[in-house]
A protein has these predicted regions:
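Acidic-and-aromatic substrate-binding clefts and catalytic sites of carbohydrate-active enzymes
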Residues: 102-103, 131, 169-175, 198-205, ...
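Mid-to-C-terminal alpha-helical segments outside catalytic/metal-binding sites
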Residues: 17, 22-63, 71-76, 80, ...
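Hydrophobic faces of well-ordered beta-strands that scaffold small-molecule active sites
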Residues: 78-80, 121-123, 163-165, 191-193, ...
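Catalytic metal-binding/acid-base residues of hydrolase active sites
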Residues: 83, 226-227, 258, 278, ...
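Aromatic-lined glycan-binding groove of carbohydrate-active enzymes
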Residues: 270-303
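Aromatic-anchored helix/helix-loop segment that forms the rim or "lid"
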Residues: 103, 251, 295-324
Length: 381
């Protein structure tokens, strides 16, 4: 049973307090499930003479920060990559994998959003979602509890949160039921999927019934990388999230486009959002074009026109080199704002975009306008 700091029981559907740090033995979840370790703002920092002087220097240098990087008085940004950690999910992760979930609370989310001028965050649960290696009723119940938690969060903070529903893939039947409930009853903005499930990438034919239903609904599918079965801990001392997450996004995109299921070609009405500026995809387009050229009958126009149909958010993909590669591959209309909170602060993405010296019009397009087009319920009246 999960309890808050006052010892009160915290059921899965209750939005209260913070995700407790569950003390167990085993691997820390940050090494295998989360995006990466949280940055320093979430750790305590002692007050010293040096820190006071550094703070004064920061104030004096504030004018050097580009105006676009300052959080506006009226929040405008829409964050499509913002994790929540429902207590019921945290408990399931500890029970199945061990370790301590990263610290998270609703107030932490709101504080970070306010600091960065984020009007609304579309939430998704943290890795690994609800998949712990078994197709069973527990995964279905956990998905339902997480989605109802997210819906309660929306009700408690109108306008600040929306959600991408988690579904119990690779359980096809359970996933179809949860899609119906989450989209029709809870009114989620779309579905969150992970790049791979027990070695099966999203283009695997086993998932065709799910994508067929999502295509019928013209649904939004937000995706997030996870630890691939093929490639964990290949380089000693380098976390999987550092090296493999971006590659795994590219693997699953390749499976959707070039795999035997031809999912991306068969179901063009699904709106895919890829994390982290598309992983390594923007750097490998010439190789995929060469592959498409060898399969002219299937890809008469090449691969890039298909990649340009997808959407990409910029969390942890907002350095000048990554943005340059992304903007070379797709137009501004396909790029969205994302933070990867609580593993990164939203201001990191704000600053990254500002450093690229985009026009005000392009910034508005990325930070809000594209989201308003995809999610019209978010647009201010």
């Amino acid at each position: 049973m999960l309890t808050d700091r006052k010892g009160r029981r915290m059921p899965g559907g209750q939005v209260e307090g913070e995700t407790p740090m569950l003390k167990t033995t085993g691997l820390n979840l940050l090494s295998g499930c989360a995006c990466c370790e949280p940055r320093a703002p979430f750790a305590a920092t002692p007050v010293t003479r040096r820190s006071i002087l550094a703070g004064g220097a920061a104030v004096l240098s504030a004018a050097a920060v580009p105006a676009a990087a300052q959080a506006p008085a009226k929040p405008r940004r829409i964050d499509v990559h913002h994790h929540i950690i429902p207590p019921v999910q945290a408990e399931a992760i500890v029970r199945n994998r061990g370790g301590n979930p990263v610290k998270w609370s609703v107030s932490m989310s709101l504080e970070d959003m306010d600091k960065a001028g984020v009007a609304t965050s579309i939430t998704s649960v943290q890795n690994p979602g609800v998949w712990f290696g078994k197709v069973d009723e527990d995964a279905r119940k956990l998905a339902r509890a997480c989605n109802e938690y997210a819906a309660k969060l929306e009700q408690d903070h109108p306008g600040r949160f929306r959600s991408f529903a988690v579904i119990p893939l690779p359980d096809t039947e359970g996933s179809l039921r949860e899609i119906e409930y989450a989209l029709d009853v809870l009114k989620a903005e779309g579905v969150a999927l992970w790049t791979v499930y027990s070695g099966k990438y999203l283009g695997d034919p086993a998932f065709v019934p799910v994508f067929e239903e999502l295509n019928r609904r013209k649904a939004v599918v937000y995706t997030h990388p996870t630890t691939p079965d093929c490639c964990g801990n290949l380089v000693k001392g380098v976390p999987v999230s550092t090296l493999e997450y971006n590659h795994d996004t590219t693997r699953t995109i390749a499976s959707l486009v070039f795999g035997e299921g031809k999912t991306a070609l068969r179901f063009p009405d699904i709106k895919f959002i890829w994390s982290h500026s598309g992983g390594t995809l923007p750097f490998l387009t010439s190789r995929f074009e060469e592959l498409a050229g060898r399969r002219k009958q299937e890809f008469p126009n090449g691969a890039v026109p298909i990649f340009r149909r997808f959407y990409y958010e910029v969390a942890q993909g907002n350095t000048p080199g990554m943005l340059a590669a992304l903007f070379h591959m797709v137009p501004m209309s396909q790029v969205m704002f994302g933070s990867d909170f609580p593993y990164r602060e939203a201001m990191e993405a704000v600053q990254g975009l500002a450093n690229y010296k985009l026009s005000e019009a392009d910034l508005r397009t990325i930070e809000s306008e594209n989201a308003y087009k995809m999610f019209p319920r978010l647009k201010p009246a």
